[in-house]
From Swiss-Prot:
Pfam families: Oxidored_q5_N, Proton_antipo_M. It comes from Homo sapiens (Human). Belongs to the complex I subunit 4 family. One of its GO terms (biological process) is response to hypoxia. GO terms for molecular function: NADH dehydrogenase (ubiquinone) activity; ubiquinone binding. This is NADH-ubiquinone oxidoreductase chain 4. The gene is MT-ND4. It is a multi-pass membrane protein. It is an enzyme of class 7 (translocase).
Length: 459
């Protein structure tokens, strides 16, 4: 794993030693080269020592998430150039250092084999994210958003730490591989039920589950473009990854405890989708759509079948790329109109036809149109929820309908209609922006040709 961690750490001195005119080129190209390294981990069936050590290791669940994390760093750097154009050089370097340190902590979180190390790095991701939101956000409300983000995450994570200490005192080890192989069947007692809640609550806040989601729209809306992209694409996936790892160890207790959370996530999925139909703020709409998609992932994980895990992993990767793409498009609108209100940016199709094309593709990917990878993820989850209970088909089917409605509502409101009077001159779409959209969309479309590489555990 050091072949991935060390080059990423070396991006920090590269950033600070780069000249003013080379800082963007150096960081983008080197981070793009680093994003190729996780592809080597797909060979681990024949060569297991390739990516395994006592401290860090990768498996078919970790590797797709590592790919997503490393692929996203060059994209966030490309997306932030306009946002940072008026900042002094030292602040640009500090901003890039925050993004790189966030990537380092994410890689270590996904690959940690000890649960206490996983917890430490899980919490470490909070620091650079909080700095990015509260320092580089656009509006004064960013401080309020940062407070929500901090307290929700910390309060949710404290029971996890207590549960980990209790488990270590009881079993003498917190190694994920050992715990998975030697897991005892937990009885359905009050103490074990509370321990299950303590283990999963941190991840349900992070996902977030409906009811624990109030921090997410605020954080998304107030964060700068890189903050929104990383938050939507990778940080929410930490919750899904942690739940997948720990619910397997806590079986068969998960099967007893899952029912209220399954109902809550299915209900929350429809509620948040419906909220999207009433949004006027573009970033807020995309944030609520993230909650809706992640509710489907929570449902899949709690059903605890190999197929549902496959659907959850595919959906996490697909949602990471799609939501990041939507935030990039929303940011391109914001940089030109200086407003997140959708009605004020209507009719942009006449001025920016190529950007309208990216908007159309992003909206169609969001509603899971073939041949995107989103469709495969949603169908896998749909089939597993239906086999678990027939009634869920009504809820998941209704959710797909509402998702299609708000995706088309978002596209038509921003692209069609007559131009508003305050838009009198507008810069055309830049090559950088078009490259950015292409680099988001190409994996969404290409992964559908060979989805085996991101099917997680079942591979």
């Amino acid at each position: 794993m050091l072949k991935l961690i060390v080059p990423t750490i070396m991006l920090l001195p590269l950033t600070w030693l780069s000249k003013k005119h080379m800082i963007w080129i150096n960081t983008t190209t080197h981070s793009l080269i680093i994003s190729i390294i996780p592809l080597l981990f797909f060979n681990q069936i024949n060569n297991n020592l390739f990516s395994c050590s006592p401290t860090f290791s990768s498996d078919p669940l970790t590797t797709p998430l590592l790919m997503l994390t490393t692929w996203l760093l060059p994209l966030t750097i490309m997306a932030s150039q306009r946002h940072l154009s008026s900042e002094p050089l030292s602040r640009k370097k500090l901003y890039l250092s925050m993004l790189i340190s966030l990537q380092i902590s994410l890689i270590m979180t996904f690959t940690a084999t000890e649960l206490i190390m996983f917890y430490i790095f899980f919490e470490t991701t909070l620091i650079p994210t909080l700095a990015i939101i509260t320092r580089w956000g656009n509006q004064p409300e960013r401080l309020n958003a940062g407070t929500y983000f901090l307290f929700y995450t910390l309060v949710g994570s404290l029971p996890l730490l207590i549960a980990l200490i209790y488990t270590h005192n009881t079993l003498g080890s917190l190694n994920i591989l050992l715990l998975t192989l030697t897991a005892q069947e937990l009885s359905n007692s009050w103490a074990n039920n509370l321990m299950w809640l303590a283990y999963t609550m941190a991840f349900m806040v992070k996902m977030p589950l409906y009811g624990l989601h109030l921090w997410l729209p605020k954080a998304h809306v107030e964060a700068p473009i890189a903050g929104s992209m990383v938050l939507a694409a990778v940080l929410l996936k930490l919750g899904g990854y942690g739940m997948m790892r720990l619910t397997l160890i806590l079986n068969p207790l998960t099967k007893h405890m899952a029912y209220p959370f399954l109902v809550l996530s299915l209900w929350g999925m429809i509620m948040t989708s419906s909220i999207c139909l009433r949004q006027t703020d573009l970033k807020s709409l995309i944030a609520y759509s993230s909650i809706s998609h992640m509710a489907l992932v929570v449902t899949a994980i709690l059903i605890q079948t190999p197929w549902s895990f496959t659907g959850a992993v595919i959906l996490m990767i697909a949602h990471g790329l799609t939501s990041s793409l939507l935030f990039c498009l929303a940011n391109s609108n914001y940089e030109r109109t200086h407003s997140r209100i959708m009605i004020l940016s209507q009719g942009l199709q006449t001025l920016l036809p190529l950007m309208a094309f990216w908007w159309l593709l992003a909206s169609l990917a969001n509603l899971a149109l073939p041949p995107t990878i989103n469709l495969l993820g949603e169908l896998s989850v749909l089939v597993t929820t239906f086999s678990w209970s027939n009634i869920t088909l009504l809820l998941t089917g209704l959710n797909m309908l509402v998702t299609a409605l708000y995706s088309l509502y978002m596209f038509t409101t921003t692209q069609w209609g007559s131009l508003t009077h305050h838009i009198n001159n507008m810069k055309p779409s830049f090559t950088r922006e078009n490259t950015l959209m292409f680099m988001h969309l190409s994996p969404i479309l290409l992964l559908s040709l060979n989805p085996d590489i991101i099917t997680g555990f079942s591979s």
